[in-house]
Each structure stands twice: as C-alpha cells, then as structure tokens.
Amino acid sequence: MSITVEEKARLIKEYATKEGDTGSPEVQVAILSSRIATLTEHFKSHKKDNHSRRGLLMMVAQRRKLLDYLKKKEEARYTALIARLGLRR
C-alpha cells in the first residue's frame, strides 16, 4: 500500500526546487498524491478496510493543508503544482 523507495526518490528528484530538497511543499504534496492514488486503488478491491480509509482521509487533509499554505505564500507555485499533478482545484 505504500510507495517504493525508488518511486519516492523519483518524485523527490522531479519536484525538488533545489538539490537535496525533500521538505518543500511541492515534494510533500507529490509524495502524498502518489500515496493517495495507491490507497485509492487498494480500496477498489478492499471496500471494508476502514483502518486504511482513516489513513487516506488524514493524507488528503494533510495535502489540503500544504496546498492551502502554498496558495497563501506563492500562488504561482501553487497553480503550477496543481497543473503538473493534475489535481482539480
């Protein structure tokens, strides 16, 4: 249900703003989006897995907070990120 180390490293490299950047909102949102997509696929076959569903809801809330923060600080970066990730906002 989680993403692999290689997938996480690829996301960090793709969305990092500078070398060694793992904590920027862009990287965090990209990793959360990947984990959310993985869990969404999991729920297609495990409809009654409510413990994981709670984790999914917490991840969605965390992503929402990070996106709101980014929109408040720099709206240009926010719009570029949601366009790259294909999020509907």
From Swiss-Prot:
One of its GO terms (cellular component) is cytosolic small ribosomal subunit. The keyword Ribosomal protein applies. GO terms for molecular function: rRNA binding; structural constituent of ribosome. The keyword RNA-binding applies. Keywords: Ribonucleoprotein, Ribosomal protein, RNA-binding, rRNA-binding. Gene3D superfamilies: 6.10.250.3130, S15/NS1, RNA-binding. Part of the 30S ribosomal subunit. Forms a bridge to the 50S subunit in the 70S ribosome, contacting the 23S rRNA. Belongs to the universal ribosomal protein uS15 family. One of the primary rRNA binding proteins, it binds directly to 16S rRNA where it helps nucleate assembly of the platform of the 30S subunit by binding and bridging several RNA helices of the 16S rRNA. This is Small ribosomal subunit protein uS15. It comes from Cereibacter sphaeroides (strain ATCC 17025 / ATH 2.4.3).
